Amino acid sequence: MDGNHTIWIEKYRPRRLDEMVGQKDIVVRLQSYVKTGNLPHLLFTGSAGIGKTTAAVALAREFFGDSWQTNFREMNASDERGIDVVRNQIKEFARTSPLAGATFKILFLDEADALTTDAQAALRRTMETYARTCRFILSCNYSSKIIDPIQSRCAIYRFRPLDREAVIEETRRIAAAEGLTVTEGALDAIVYVASGDMRKAINALQGAAILRTDIDEETIFEITATARPEEIDELLDLSIGGRFDEAEQALLELTHVRGIAPNELINQCYRALVQRDIDRTLKVKLIDALGETDFRLSEGASSDIQMEALLARFVLAAEQHR
C-alpha cells in the first residue's frame, strides 16, 4: 500500500466523465457536448466534494485529449476576489488562441461566488468578448451569489450531495485497491462523516489507513474528530430534558477532551434535530438557537461561552414548551 505517499483524492479522481460517481443525469448532458464538439459557458453549483471540479477537468480531457493541459486552466476565485484578477489573469488567458488544433479553450473558475460584484461584472464582459476563443466553467457553492447577467449566459448544473450507495461503493473500491479491510460499521461512519461529500469520505479513509489496515467505526470517528450520532442524541436528550449540568459535562467531553470543533457539533446537532420526531414548534426554536450560535461563532465570539449558552437556550426552550 502506497497510500501514505500520495493524496488519494487526486490518485482516485476520475479521469473521464463516465468514471464519475453519482451525478448521472449531469454526466449524460456533459457527454452530449463532447459528441457535438461544442460547449456553452457552464455554471456548476452545489456543496463541496460532490464532483464539480472533477467534472470540469474530465470534460477538458475529453474535449482536448492529450493537449488538454495546454487548453485548460483552473483558477480559484477565493485567492484573489477583486477586479484585477479578471482584468489581468483571466483576460490574458481568454484572449489568446487555443493550441493543438482546438477550436476553443476552457477556463475553470472555482469558488466564483467569492468574486466581488464589480469583479463579476467585469467577468461577464470578458465572457462575452472572448466567447469565440474561450469557454468558461464557473463553480460555486451558492448560485444566489452569482449575478444574474452571468447566470443568464450559462447552462446551469446543480450538483447534488452523493447518496449513501455511491459513497459506500466508491469507498469499497478504494479500500480494495489499497488492501484495506473496512467493517460495515466503518462504512456507516464514513457515510455519516461525509454527509454526501466524497472528498471527505476519501480523506477519512486515508487518514484511518495511516493508523491501521483493519478499519472500524471507532477509527473513523477518531481520525475525523467527529462525535458519534448517539453522542449527539445524548447531548440533545440531556439539554431538552432540562439536565443542564449533565449536558454541560457531555459538551466538555466532546469539545475539550475529544477536541471536536464547536461548529462541527452545531452541524451535527442540526442534522440530528432535522431528523428528530419532536413537536414542530420546539424544533423550530431549537434550530433557531443553533443558527444564532453558529452566526455568533462566525463573528468571533467565545466558543466556550456560546456553546454553553446554546445548551441554556435548549433547556429554556424545552421548559417553556412543557
Swiss-Prot record:
Gene3D superfamilies: 1.10.8.60, 1.20.272.10, P-loop containing nucleotide triphosphate hydrolases (3.40.50.300). Heteromultimer composed of small subunits (RfcS) and large subunits (RfcL). The keyword Hydrolase does not apply. This is Replication factor C small subunit. SUPFAM superfamilies: P-loop containing nucleoside triphosphate hydrolases, post-AAA+ oligomerization domain-like. Keywords: ATP-binding, DNA replication, Nucleotide-binding. The lineage of its organism: Archaea, Methanobacteriati, Methanobacteriota, Stenosarchaea group, Methanomicrobia. It comes from the Archaea. Belongs to the activator 1 small subunits family. RfcS subfamily. InterPro entries: AAA+_ATPase (IPR003593), ATPase_AAA_core (IPR003959), DNA_pol3_clamp-load_cplx_C (IPR008921), DNA_Rep/Repair_Clamp_Loader (IPR050238), P-loop_NTPase (IPR027417), Rep_factor-C_ssu_arc (IPR023748), Rep_factorC_C (IPR013748), RFC_lid (IPR047854). It holds the Pfam family Rep_fac_C. ATP binds at G46, S47, A48, G49, I50, G51, K52, T53. GO terms for molecular function: ATP binding; ATP hydrolysis activity; DNA binding; DNA clamp loader activity. The keyword Glycoprotein does not apply. GO terms for biological process: DNA repair; DNA-templated DNA replication. PANTHER family: REPLICATION FACTOR C / DNA POLYMERASE III GAMMA-TAU SUBUNIT, REPLICATION FACTOR C SUBUNIT 4. Part of the RFC clamp loader complex which loads the PCNA sliding clamp onto DNA. It comes from Methanoculleus marisnigri (strain ATCC 35101 / DSM 1498 / JR1). One of its GO terms (cellular component) is DNA replication factor C complex.
